[in-house]
Amino acid sequence: RQYPDILYGNMIKVDADGRVIGKSREVEYSLRQYYSATMNHDCCYIRRSLFEKYGYYDELLKIVSDWKWFLQAIGLGDVRPVYADIDVTLFDTNGISETNLDLRNAERRQVLEEVMPSAILADYDKHAFDMEQMSRLRRHKWAYRLTWFVERCLFKFEKWRRK
């Protein structure tokens, strides 16, 4: 029987009072996804051989050491995580990774500049906002259809104008 390299489940987010405020879901992980988001290590089961291939978490980083590892293994590597719809862990949203966003963002930027080719990073920097907007629009069918319609109208208008 073949087991996945990374198996991940649900992470339940809880606030300071222990109330459930959210739950992770299955996500299609890609380099674009890792540019601004991550897979949480605490709801993952990772095959040991991956640490031998990609190294261990970078302990010089205070917040994003797991993010860096996943970026290298999944975003830039060939590892494909497999999702199981089971609750694995509770995540306290009052920890340093959720409350010290300035440090988290600075560390992420440091990692991106370290591991991504500069030309690719420049493209991501240039188009990150547009990609995030399109991702948000796709979650709302009516907004996505409206955007598609406007884009088609602009295409026809520009084509007509060139004549």
Residues covered by each model-derived region:
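Conserved nucleotide-sugar donor-binding catalytic segment
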Residues: G9, A16, I21-V111
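A short, conserved acidic/glycine-rich loop-to-beta-strand motif
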Residues: Q2-I12
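TPR/TPR-like (Sel1-like) alpha-helical repeat modules
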Residues: L112-M116
